[in-house]
């Protein structure tokens, strides 16, 4: 059984696998990767980092949907 950690996604505590990547979190939350920015513990992540960055206990993740319009 995979070890679980607690992370905070947009302020809400979530139990997730300790092996989960930021990219997997984006998919789990059904967000469109091209239309979202991710901040981890106060640092903005580049999209190419998402597959390499594994969540850790206590991480604070902010998923910000980008909206454009006039």
Kindly label every feature range from the protein language model.
Residues 1-69:
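Ubiquitin-like/PB1-type beta-grasp interaction modules and other compact soluble beta-rich domains
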């Amino acid at each position: 059984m995979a070890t679980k950690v607690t992370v905070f996604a947009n302020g809400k505590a979530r139990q997730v696998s300790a092996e989960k990547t930021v990219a997997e979190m984006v998919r789990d939350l059904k967000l469109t990767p091209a239309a979202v920015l991710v901040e981890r513990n106060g640092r903005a992540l580049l999209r190419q980092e998402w597959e390499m960055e594994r969540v850790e206990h206590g991480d604070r993740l902010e998923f910000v949907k980008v909206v454009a319009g006039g």
